[in-house]
Amino acid sequence: MNWRSEHIWIELITGSRKISNFCWACILFLGSLGFLLVGTSSYFGRNLISLFPSQQIVFFPQGIVMCFYGIAGLFISSYLWCTISWSVGSGYDKFDRKEGIVCIFRWGFPGRNRRIFFRFRIRDIRSIRIEVKEGLFPRRVLYMEIGGRGDIPLTRTDENLTPREIEQKAAESAYFLRVPIEVF
């Protein structure tokens, strides 16, 4: 969602609360729970899940490996659920031409540096840079080049934009900020 007027442009960033993250967290949780239940049912010799008879799976080595995969999957699943609940990576980009200030805010992991906030002047922005890497896994990222601070990405690296979409976004940003576009 974006909000734009003549002098202010606010772009909201989704972060980790994407549908794909919800799907992966659910699939991983259910799959690892299944592995753990099958492994423990082979240990106890009882059917905790009616889909697989526990007599067909020997505890050593198959049951141990399934328990290990189940526990590892539950840890990874809990990590995904935590990043979703903490909304890691979400925030906003605010460009204010009237004040001459750019604010970039993102939520991070809990702790001392949970709030990631950059603030700088529009006149410090040198250019909007498009980085394109073609090949088997193409990558197109939009950066804001700032004097003395380096480059700040404006698009996520996992956001697969088409060449037309990345050009459109770069043109809108460069036009609003009145800076040139560079392509690498």
From Swiss-Prot:
Keyword vocabulary terms for this entry: Chloroplast, Membrane, Photosynthesis, Plastid, Thylakoid, Transmembrane, Transmembrane helix
Subcellular location: Plastid, Chloroplast thylakoid membrane
Chief place where the protein resides: plastid
One Pfam family per UniProt: Ycf4
Domain of life: Eukaryota
Disulfide cysteine pairs (residue numbers): none
Transmembrane segments: 19-39, 57-77
GO terms (BP aspect): photosynthesis
Protein family according to the UniProt entry: Belongs to the Ycf4 family.
Its job: Seems to be required for the assembly of the photosystem I complex.
Name of the protein described by the UniProt record: Photosystem I assembly protein Ycf4
Organism: Nymphaea alba (White water-lily)
Annotated gene: ycf4
